[in-house]
Amino acid sequence: MRVAVAVCFVLLACASPSYTADQEPAVTVLVAYHSLSGNTEKMAREVATGAKAVLGTRVVLKRVGEVTGPDLFSSDALIVGSPVYWSNMAGEVKTFFDNWQLKFGVFPEFKMRNKVGAAFTTGGQVSSGKELTMLTILAAMLGNQMIVVSGGGAFGASATTEGDSPGVDEKEAASARELGKRVAEVAGVVKRGSVK
């Protein structure tokens, strides 16, 4: 009898989810970025900090070239950051999106469908193409049937990093944190069906 009870407990433990009845499943936010100067990486870290501020959020922070298929498909949300190169996303970020099909096989099932997506950028000048860059990132997400959100700004978060505004200032960092927080909140609503 004791053996039968022990076996039942083991089976129940293996079959139950990794959270208790009063806990919600964690939301996983993947923050993927490309950075040469360190400015976009700083924004990525701020985005991650904002997402972590939402209770029950797990954050994975990686350069776009390090992201694996399991990273992508196990996430509930994806926030992509790029420096502005010629008023567009960096080639490494474009390759990341191209690899969704070439390496990870997202089609024809639309494996990113209904995941939450957002964008952030850094650019040297005030009108260097930051909004356009965010829109190209968001367009790639929309093409994959993701749910895109903003936060911190109309299209995401951005920083001007040259001239009279070198690096990422506190206002820009706060905008990045707000983006991360909003994405984590929306991902929680999508995953759980309600606001916590």
Q: What is each stretch, according to the model?
A:
Residues 4-13:
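Bacterial N-terminal signal peptides
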Residues 27-51:
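N-terminal beta1-alpha1 ligand-phosphate binding loop
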